[in-house]
């Protein structure tokens, strides 16, 4: 019996050792001009490094969006506060040394690199512009750090994401209330869609790019939805759009180009992400200082967790679908934080404090 107990104990220890992983995440601190590299070992979140970013020592340049290249060799950072234009920065992972930068539009924000084209697509949010100023998506060669095109979309575009196959790019425009589809290969705007659960106007669901700018400029009435984020399902058949202004997330069938489900959320939903196994949608509630977890099969919210401070921001989920990493800005001089949620038991398991106004996150790697 004693030998059997020891054998079972050895097996348990061995299995737990094999399953232990280190998860590495980059997170911006917008009011600190820093990027934090965080390592989560399954129990504790460690701030491995605080990386100063930008080139102006006495000015806050505002690191906002961040993404890691598909090969994991570089990370890219949008610096929102330009004079007047912002920049895209390129850094080497590991050493975290700056490689290059390129000037873009007004307040560059969210970005992602296409698996199909290898190009980087980044929205120019134009936070301080007028509510009728049409902005753009910049398309950048991340190897040469050259902007090769700009595609006009709507007013205050945000939430730049691509299908997993890299062939289609999606973004939303906060003050236009619309979703935009760009062909990643041809760099052309193909379709637009109102993010309102009930389609009210003919032009809301029409899919032509030729008159898009004129149509948006003529519609001075701001839609109440104020969409802030879009994220594709791993099957590349569905999209999830966060309507910050009307407290809901809409599920969109890409082929039908229509809304098929609406999830009523807590106050001020802001970002979202779908786990790679397709089971869960994690939504940050900026206005409620909470994070929600939705079961996509049932359409029900299965967990809602209070965050450690106010102003919940972004979320990224580990590739093994085990953990959600949530950034929480904090208020004033309060440090920002990255919180770790276990998607097996829906509990918060770790918190790492970083610089002020924690914002964009990007997953780097997992190591055994």
Regions found by a protein language model. Name each.
Residues 4-13:
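Sec-dependent N-terminal signal peptides
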Residues 15-368:
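Predominantly soluble domains enriched in secretory-pathway, periplasmic, or organellar proteins
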């Amino acid at each position: 019996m004693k030998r059997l107990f020891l054998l079972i104990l050895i097996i348990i220890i061995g299995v737990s050792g094999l399953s232990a992983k280190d998860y590495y995440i980059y997170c911006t601190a917008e009011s600190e001009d820093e990027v934090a590299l965080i390592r989560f070992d399954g129990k504790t979140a460690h701030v491995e490094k605080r990386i100063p970013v930008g080139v102006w020592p006495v000015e806050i340049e505002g690191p906002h969006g961040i993404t890691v290249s598909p090969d994991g060799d570089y990370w890219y950072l949008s610096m929102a506060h330009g004079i007047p234009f912002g920049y895209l920065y390129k850094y080497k992972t590991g050493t975290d040394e700056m490689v290059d930068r390129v000037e873009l539009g007004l307040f560059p924000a969210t970005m992602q690199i296409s698996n199909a084209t290898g190009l980087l697509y980044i929205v120019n949010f134009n936070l301080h512009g007028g509510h009728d100023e049409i902005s753009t998506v910049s398309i950048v060669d991340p190897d040469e750090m050259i902007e090769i095109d700009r595609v006009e979309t709507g007013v205050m575009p945000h939430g730049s994401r691509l299908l997993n196959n890299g062939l289609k790019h999606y973004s939303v425009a906060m003050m236009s209330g619309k979703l935009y589809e760009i062909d990643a290969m041809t760099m052309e705007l193909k379709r637009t869609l109102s993010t309102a659960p009930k389609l009210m106007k003919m032009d809301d669901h029409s899919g032509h790019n030729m008159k898009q700018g004129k149509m948006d400029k003529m519609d001075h009435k701001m839609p109440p939805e104020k969409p802030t984020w879009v994220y594709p399902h791993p099957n590349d058949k569905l999209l999830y759009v966060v309507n910050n202004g009307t407290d809901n997330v809409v599920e969109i069938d890409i082929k039908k180009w229509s809304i098929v489900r609406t999830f009523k959320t807590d106050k001020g939903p802001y970002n979202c992400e779908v786990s790679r196994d397709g089971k869960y949608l994690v939504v940050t509630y900026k206005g409620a200082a909470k994070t929600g977890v939705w079961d996509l099969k049932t359409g029900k919210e299965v967990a809602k967790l209070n965050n450690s401070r106010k102003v919940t921001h972004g979320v990224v989920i580990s590739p093994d679908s085990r953990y959600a990493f949530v950034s929480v800005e904090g208020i004033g001089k309060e440090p920002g934080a990255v919180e770790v949620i276990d998607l097996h038991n829906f509990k918060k398991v770790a918190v790492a404090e970083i610089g002020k106004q924690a914002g964009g996150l990007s997953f780097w790697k997992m190591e055994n």
